[in-house]
Amino acid sequence: MGRKLLGLLMLAVLLAGCAGVPSSSAPQAIGTVERPAPSNLPKPTPGMDPDVLLREFLKATADPANRHLAARQFLTQSASNAWDDAGSALLIDHVVFVETRAAERVSATMRADILGSLSDMGVFETAEGVLPDPGPIELVKTSGGWRIDRLPNGVFLDWQQFQATYKRNTLYFADPTGKTVVPDPRYVAVPDHDQLATELVSKLIAGPRPEMAHTVRNLLAPPLRLRGPVTRADGGKSGIGRGYGGARIDLEKLSTTDPHSRQLVAAQIIWTLARADIRGPYVINADGAPLDDRFRDGWTTSDVAATDPGVADGAGAGLHALVNGSLVSLDGQHTVVVPGAFGRMGDQTGAALSRNGRQVASVVTLHRGAPDMAASLWIGDLGAEAVQSADGHSLSRPTWSLDDVVWVVVDGNNVLRAIQEPASGQPARLPVDSVAVATRFPGPITDLQLSRDSTRAAMVIGGQVILASVEQTQAGQYALTYPRRLGFGLGNSVVSLSWRTGDDIVVTRTDSSHPVSYVNLDGVNSDAPPHGVQMPVTTVVANPSTAYVAGPQGVLQYSPSADGQQGWSEVPGLTVPGAAPVLPG
């Protein structure tokens, strides 16, 4: 990353309170692959006014190919030689140039709003704030018209052109348990669809973003490499992943020999390509032989369905709810109190089913809101008895990890994991290191929910959505690392949150105009329709198809994929004031 731009980015982060952008240990220009420039990029013309030329230059920086060759056409040779375009870029909008003009030379300063950043790996993160003065930009008149003769190091991307040039794709890496794959969204500028598969597999081999380096496994890590570009399954170079053409991936230097690891190699490749609309069959070879002889003619997504990142946890368990402080299930349009401890206990204020839907973790709160308020965490099989596993003045709504361990926040600041000791069967409370979160975002954690793959934790702190990585240390302990804020547009209005997918979070808010919103891993937020929602809304739970929220009239549901559904509808049987929805997670 250029020193000037790094300094500007750090200053902007301090001013705006936005999250820093991770940079790789060996920065490189964004997208150094040599390929044709997109046809919609501007070029300098002899009659172009200096102000127009500067704006067109910012648009041209959206193409990273060949070390920003498209943008370098706007520079004099000396400026091009001096310009350091390595590292991350700032995405800017509402640009104003303040110019001082002479006959043969123009000096300009740039003012703009910062909307985000794009790392050298293609990681985009939203931000907010005003661009600190990057330094003067100077233009000179040449025989071919005005050209930029001096400019700050680093890359400034025009927001509109960025949206037109880059496309969001998702890489997938294996979770530590090998049960599923974890999303790592990237933005790539590849105008030729036939080059996209090669670009994505190359990025897989290069590895995950820095904040994921200790939370996922990359079965495609070096020395493994591509033997050549990805082709059609029959070796053709056009129509890759289109129709029935499929894709052929030839790898070499694969050290993995056990079948499960090879299955994960395939899963990483297949889900990455399939989610980019590069269709199979996927012929995957390693060192001149099929990755797995069973699939020498090609893999499909069905062959790696066990790791499907889009599968809903415990789908067969169905929707449950807390009604009058007890756990109920739905039988058609009627509720049934569940047997066992969770149906008998009253005063339950937050609950979650385990990922497989067979266990329950629930918080019982006595004297809620009073000085002597007391909360306790209970864990047990659904329909059976429960064991008290933690207590405190207050406890957050529990959340389950992929390995069936319950996480909860005690008294707003102490994150712990509640487990059963293997030898004694007794409950044990293991602290989670959350110093990085508390240092950067001080204040009580009012909600904490683990992602389906359990490599990320989303939290509500001071009405803001804070995302952190879940790292397991060499000693076997856990820590929340790389905390950053998501959804600047949500302000401080967030009440509760839930993971809809591994990349998308649903939140309830105190904003009556937008009571329910979504925010993704990039930090981009959008709003669900407000129709049918009464304020206030509190608990939210979600799966890939449906979001459920607790409101004054009971539990409401919304399915974005449902044809013609423009608002929220009541859940039959749960139109009870104070009812709170419960799902696996």
UniProtKB/Swiss-Prot annotation:
Chief subcellular location: membrane
Membrane topology of this protein: Lipid-anchor
Cellular compartments annotated: Cell membrane
Coiled coil spans: none
Signal peptide: 1-17
InterPro entries listed in its UniProt record: GerMN, Lipoprotein_LpqB, Lipoprotein_LpqB_C
Region entry Disordered, spans: 24-48, 560-585
Lipidation (S-diacylglycerol cysteine): 18
UniProt keyword Transmembrane helix present: no
NCBIfam families: PRK13616.1
HAMAP family, per database record: LpqB_lipoprot
Entry protein name: Lipoprotein LpqB
Origin species: Mycolicibacterium paratuberculosis (strain ATCC BAA-968 / K-10) (Mycobacterium paratuberculosis)
Top-level taxonomy: Bacteria, Bacillati, Actinomycetota, Actinomycetes, Mycobacteriales
